[in-house]
Swiss-Prot record:
Protein name according to UniProt: 2-succinyl-5-enolpyruvyl-6-hydroxy-3-cyclohexene-1-carboxylate synthase
Tree of life domain: Bacteria
GO molecular function per UniProt: 2-succinyl-5-enolpyruvyl-6-hydroxy-3-cyclohexene-1-carboxylic-acid synthase activity; magnesium ion binding; manganese ion binding; thiamine pyrophosphate binding
Gene: menD
Broad class of enzyme this protein falls into: transferase
Family stated for the protein in its record: Belongs to the TPP enzyme family. MenD subfamily.
GO BP terms, alphabetized: menaquinone biosynthetic process
Subunit details: Homodimer.
Coiled-coil ranges from the UniProt annotation: none
Keywords tagged on the record: Magnesium, Manganese, Menaquinone biosynthesis, Metal-binding, Thiamine pyrophosphate, Transferase
Organism of this sequence: Geobacillus kaustophilus (strain HTA426)
Pathway: Quinol/quinone metabolism; 1,4-dihydroxy-2-naphthoate biosynthesis; 1,4-dihydroxy-2-naphthoate from chorismate: step 2/7; Quinol/quinone metabolism; menaquinone biosynthesis
Length: 577
């Protein structure tokens, strides 16, 4: 006869699988033994054992981000669970579905000085969409139904709009080793199946769609702003809507609008450089902005929207309240793709295209041409990495971009292309931690994958490289090594020379070759762009882990960025004369 621990753990795990979980990331530990062994015995789950908890959590986040469905994450009790915290925060803000299962001591061992027992109740606070402290294992039918139901609820809550992490705290008494065989699965499935959930996406009633379309079509100077958003079908729908409304689209690199076979007539990729030119920025102020997704990375765009509060900003979001400019006039709580399709049902072709739209597209063409013309052809420049990768990556590849300078350079130098590419990043809390692990997690589902990352961020997550070795993953990592925090050289702190290097520049003078080799990777340092192209091409064709270290100068990087922005401003000013 099956014991309570075995059937209860099996019911919980089978409930996760029946609700749609197919991958689980596990951190080793004793108290989580019932969950880990039940998962290992389940035929519908693929497991990834990641030793470092912080890395494991970001790995699960990257996997869930790329798969766009919940991933289970399991650890033992104590500080192991606390180490999941940074990834849980990122998952919450970037709306990634995670089911975090933390094993715990039984109730009688809590708050009495027992070893490896911390207060895990609501450990992640408001960053968990839902929390449950499970009952201790019992073998009664109702308790097995309870375990399966809690598992199904956790998965469906994580996947519901807006997606995010949930926390399931699971206490277990010793002995901890379950005995799971076919009889256990039969017992679990004889009791009940996990509840089936039919989940829809929010849509507006037709009268609201009609009213919104009237407001948009009446605008003489309209813009669509698309921030980070990864929704199948959205690119085709929003570009069709842009054409119908004659609204240019300011497309963040994470909007998935810059790359692909969809119509890009209205997709603008150089607005960040345009809005740095004050005359152009003042002349291009719209009447209305229809905004999709999270706030774009561009600071000039953010400040421009914040400064011109007369702009009617309509924020489309399927949940939450993303208005960092505090300037939104209206919120539309709807699925983005559905809303575009609904608006298109009301759309009537415009007989006369506006000069406003044409001016924006002309400015974008001028800015992009100036950037491309003045990019250095021979010397190292970090922005060139993105123009090179746009050519080198095969159709269908994924580009994972690190925070700080890399994502900003992607915004400026990752130009629109007809090649299908998927661009990913951790832009929820925007931290530089966990990026290697996130990218390797994403590489499970998005391959080939190239990560572009700075040296401090790479150092932060060196442990993450172990996942590539343990799971035989392929990834190309372009390491931009300017020996410190390059973004600070663009900030006011750079004017304080005395303490700048100590407090902000933080040079580490690290050699990464041995660390990469320790984790079974290949490390190369190209000396020119021809070698860079060769290394990337070889890495993409051969597979495995390959770190291509591009050594740059922070001072030269700042000089070149400012030169390029000045050239764009000069060309635009000349056009506006």
């Amino acid at each position: 006869m099956a014991d309570a621990l075995s059937v209860y753990a099996a019911a919980l795990v089978d409930g996760l699988a029946q609700a749609g979980v197919t991958e689980a990331v596990i951190s080793p530990g004793s108290r989580s033994t019932p969950l880990a062994m039940a998962m290992a015995a389940h035929p519908g789950l693929r497991l990834y054992m990641n030793i470092d908890e912080r890395s494991a959590a970001f790995f699960a986040l990257g996997l869930a981000k790329a798969k766009q469905r919940p991933v289970a994450l399991v650890c033992t009790s104590g500080t192991a669970a606390a180490n999941y915290g940074p990834a849980v925060v990122e998952a919450y803000y970037s709306r990634v579905p995670l089911v975090v299962l933390t094993a715990d001591r039984p109730h009688e061992l809590r708050d009495v000085g027992a070893p490896q027992a911390i207060d895990q109740l609501h450990l992640y606070g408001r960053y968990a969409k839902w929390f449950v402290d499970l009952a201790l294992p019992e073998e009664a039918d109702d308790m097995l139904r309870y375990a399966r139901t809690m598992a199904a609820r956790a998965v469906q809550t994580a996947a519901g709009a807006p997606c995010g992490p949930v926390h399931v705290n699971a206490p277990f008494r010793e002995p901890l080793v379950p005995h799971i065989d076919e009889a256990v699965w039969e017992r679990v499935r004889s009791v009940s199946r996990a509840p089936q959930v039919w989940r829809g996406r929010p849509a507006l009633p037709q009268e609201s769609v009609s009213a919104l379309y009237e407001q948009l079509s009446a605008a003489e100077r309209g813009l669509i702003v698309c921030g980070p958003l990864d929704r199948p079908g959205f690119a085709e729908a929003v570009t069709e809507l842009a054409r119908a409304l004659d609204f240019p689209i300011l497309a963040d690199p994470l909007s998935q609008l810059r790359a692909g076979t969809h119509d890009k007539t209205y997709v603008l990729d150089s607005y960040d450089a345009i809005l740095r030119e004050e005359t152009a920025a003042s002349k291009l102020v719209p009447d209305v902005v229809l905004r999709f997704g999270a706030m774009p990375v561009s600071k000039p765009l953010f400040l421009w929207l914040k400064r011109h509060r007369a702009i009617r900003q309509i924020v489309v979001d399927d949940g939450g309240w993303r208005d960092p400019t505090l300037s939104a006039d209206s919120f539309v709580q709807s699925d983005e793709w559905i809303l575009c399709r609904q608006l298109l049902e009301w759309a009537k072709p415009k007989e006369n295209k506006s000069a406003w739209s044409a001016i924006w597209r002309e400015m974008n063409a001028i800015a992009r041409a100036a950037l491309e013309r003045h990019l250095p052809k021979e010397e190292w420049f970090e922005g060139n990495v993105f123009t090179e990768l746009a050519d080198l990556l095969p159709a269908g590849a994924a580009l994972f971009v690190g925070n700080s300078m890399p994502i900003r350079d992607a915004d400026t130098f990752l130009f629109a292309t007809d090649k299908p590419l998927r661009v990913l990043a951790n832009r929820g809390a925007n931290g530089i931690d966990g990026v290697v692990s996130s990218a390797l997690g994403a590489s499970v589902a998005a391959n080939p994958l190239v990560l572009v990352i700075g040296d401090l961020s790479f150092y932060h997550d060196l442990n993450g490289l172990l996942a590539a070795k343990m799971h035989s993953l392929s990834a190309t990592i372009v390491l931009l090594n300017n020996n410190g925090g390059g973004i600070f050289s663009f900030l006011p702190q750079a004017r304080h020379k005395g303490a700048f290097e100590t407090l902000f520049g933080t040079p580490t003078d690290l050699s990464f070759a041995h660390a990469v080799e320790m984790y079974g990777g290949r490390h190369t340092v190209p000396h020119n762009w021809a070698e860079f192209r060769r290394h990337v091409s070889e890495s993409l064709s051969s597979g495995g882990l390959h770190v291509i270290e591009v050594r740059t100068s922070r001072a030269e990087n700042v000089r070149m960025h400012r030169l390029l922005w000045n050239e764009v401003a000069r060309e635009i000013a000349k056009c506006l004369e």
